[in-house]
Amino acid sequence: MHVAHLSLVDYRSYPTLELDLRPGTTTFVGLNGQGKTNLVEAIGYVATLGSHRVSGDAPLVRQGAERAVVRAQLERGGRRALVELEITPGKANRARLNGNPVRRTRDVLGVLRTVLFAPEDLALVKGDPGERRRYLDELLVTRWPRIAGVRADYDRILRQRTALLKSAGSAMRSGRADTHTLDVWDEHLATTGAELLSARLALLADLRSPTDSAYRAVSGGQGDLELGYRSSLPLLAEGVATTPGGEAPTRDALREALLASMLEQRKSELDRGVCLVGPHRDDLVLTLGGMPAKGYASHGESWSVALGLRLASYRLLLADDEVDDPGGPVLVLDDVFAELDAGRRERLSEVVADAEQVLVTAAVPEDVPAALRGEHTDRVHVTSGAAVRGD
């Protein structure tokens, strides 16, 4: 798979942009603040409907404009597809696929697959559990786009149940509590939560081997990286399906466990007005040499872990696509080489060099390792919101 053409209208610093892209490596070179990250961010937005830099859409629209438009012409296994996104802050975004409107914007998920490496990735190791849950869920949606609907339903139900807990807790303290409605929302949360949790556990099982081998590749063979899953459910806290070789519970078993745990925690939830049970409380556990990576890994080791997670994502998607799309997902490396020591830079570049399309941003050409600066590499100079191909 590769992006053949990118078109922007009022996206970030670009009033307009038309840019042809080819398979192989393309480096976007420019000083900080010139707009090179905006280009790869736009490509990532087509793939994920989100930015790796900001949580909302408003910053994506150029100052003074009402909306931004991103169009990406894609080629995959000899087939072409055109994805068009219209981003309007405060309103529902709109999408087209091959010129035809889609019913829901998320219906274009899966058309373009990308794996992004960025300086923010260090938060996968050093950040809070929400960063690691986001990593899992974004990869889930990339592999199985229908999970986007499951996640959206879960988030909506979680918000409604939290609001009900707050109001019911106040009513309980006044002696007029009615928990029947809460029982109904418990059922909804348990059903969608079990589906999301089951998908995460299946993904975790698939990730373990490629993550460890990817970590070894970028670290130079130093140590073992293991993945675990920390859950608020006693069923999973006992270690079932959260460690290598564990057998995953069925979705029905997870649903029943969620219901039982919510019932057990109900008084505490009503007192605090928050949902204490569910996949929104869980964490991906990273263990390096038998010790938690967070808090124990050095800066360099933390980078190796983060890169290992991203490379494992790439290898997993590549294996998924090897029949229909031998080239696999588009790799995006956004200013990541400037963060790495020489050894990790060279090892990472050697691992990704064979991808069908690699998009790299760098402040200066020298930041790009030699393995990604071959004769077939395109260079695009980015200055003040303009992108010009050159030597």
Swiss-Prot record:
What's this protein's function?
A: The RecF protein is involved in DNA metabolism; it is required for DNA replication and normal SOS inducibility. RecF binds preferentially to single-stranded, linear DNA. It also seems to bind ATP.
One family from Pfam that matches here is SMC_N
Q: Which NCBIfam families match?
A: recf
- Tree of life domain: Bacteria
Q: Which CDD domains match?
A: ABC_RecF (cd03242)
Q: Family, per the entry?
A: Belongs to the RecF family.
Give the matching HAMAP family: RecF
Its GO biological process annotations read:
DNA replication; DNA synthesis involved in DNA repair; double-strand break repair; SOS response
> A single GO molecular function, which one?
ATP binding
PANTHER family registered for this protein in UniProt: DNA REPLICATION AND REPAIR PROTEIN RECF
Question: Major location, coarse class?
Answer: cytoplasm
Q: Which organism is it from?
A: Kineococcus radiotolerans (strain ATCC BAA-149 / DSM 14245 / SRS30216)
Specify the taxonomic lineage.
Bacteria, Bacillati, Actinomycetota, Actinomycetes, Kineosporiales
**What protein am I looking at?**
DNA replication and repair protein RecF
UniProt keywords, alphabetically: ATP-binding, Cytoplasm, DNA damage, DNA repair, DNA replication, DNA-binding, Nucleotide-binding, SOS response
Q: Where does it live in the cell?
A: Cytoplasm
Respond yes or no to whether keyword Cell cycle is given for this record.
no
The record lists ATP as bound by 30-37
A GO CC term assigned to this protein in UniProt: cytoplasm
Stored InterPro entries: DNA-binding_RecF, DNA-binding_RecF_CS, P-loop_NTPase, RecF/RecN/SMC_N, RecF_2
